[in-house]
Amino acid sequence: MSSYINKNQSVEILCIGSELLLGNILNSNAKWLAEQLAFIGLPHYLQSVVGDNSQRLLRIILEASRRSRVLITTGGLGPTPDDLTIETIASAFNVKLTKNNDILKDIKRKLNSHSHVSENNFKQALLPEGAEIIPNKSGTAPGIIWTPIVDFTIISLPGVPAEMKQMWIETAKPWLNVNFPERKSLTSKTLKFAGISESFLAENIVDLLDNKNPTIAPYASLGEVKLRLTAQAKTTSEAKRLIEPIEVELLKRFGLKCFAKNDETLSEIVIGLLSKRGETISLAESCTGGNLAAAFTGTPGASEVFLGGIVAYNNSIKENVLGVPIELIKKHGAVSQPVAKEMALGILKIFNTDWSIAISGIAGPSGSTLNKPIGRVEIFIAGPNVNESIQENFGSYRAREEIQKLSVVRALDQLRLFLLRRS
């Protein structure tokens, strides 16, 4: 047994399929199962991906039997020749497959309306002797819960995410809850930050990073930094109490830089603040090409506050629709504070909103000058007693999509700060 794993309650995830190994399909099953295991408080130390190869699959199954109490597999339960999971599991422990007549009837019933049914479909009714069946209400491939040797159980689920999730919720998860009653409750809370880098955040929490319970894990996405606080205790309420003082300390250190907790998004926060104040917003975009509008419209409740916007990508639209004087564009360039200001004031007038945001920039890979490099973005926010110009240089090394995303995050976050300060 591997020395770094406590086999008492450890769970391992194995996702099967060459399409996963080659990167053709995102391995969303592993992510979802890992979150589920954390939620029910079972330790999960290892994930693997293996292609549709029986020898490699066999080796990983045997290795898992020596180091983990439970192996959860997804994929390889279908009717095609490369679906090898069940027969390889049986082979690993020298157990014969037997035909399950109930499963066979279920497969025939589900395939009755199909014009062509292959004999391969019926191999899904061949299961290891003694295995508990996990019914599949949506597909033809049943799952199994099987304990082939002492202290080792295999839970096999389909690779189709919808089928896998349903079978986990209805059968696999309840089985784990019953068979691992002594597990501790694991609770996590995520704090989200904008306007600071991951390195800055880490430098200012060095004294907290060594905490064992709760643990603090920083990780970054484009324009945002997150801190996940995770505590383990006998009960969920005890775990939450362990997190509270750390959360208070972090909010004390970073203040308004923390914009949300858990699954809340920046656009949800902004829309909530606008809605609370009964205020509206309109947008004038150039380099972001409607991405800021998409951030609003992709959020429930946006119709209450977001009236509309214009993508003024061409200078003629800036001039003829938004009312930006052509002389101003010629003098300062489309990517400039004066032009961004006129764009914001123009859209404010057109839609008669309380707030407006304008964005103009150079997202690349062309269009830069000596004084205006790729990554230069001008943002202007207009609102009640607010006329604020923001210039950002996101870096010429960034991809076009990254500059667009960073511009959207920066604009939303600055609007959030204005709204909070006026509350």
Curated annotation (Swiss-Prot):
InterPro entries: CinA, CinA-like_C, CinA_C, CinA_KH, Competence-induced_CinA, MoaB/Mog-like_dom_sf, MoaB/Mog_dom. It holds the Pfam family MoCF_biosynth. Disulfide bonds: none annotated. It comes from the Bacteria. Belongs to the CinA family. This is CinA-like protein. It comes from Prochlorococcus marinus (strain SARG / CCMP1375 / SS120).
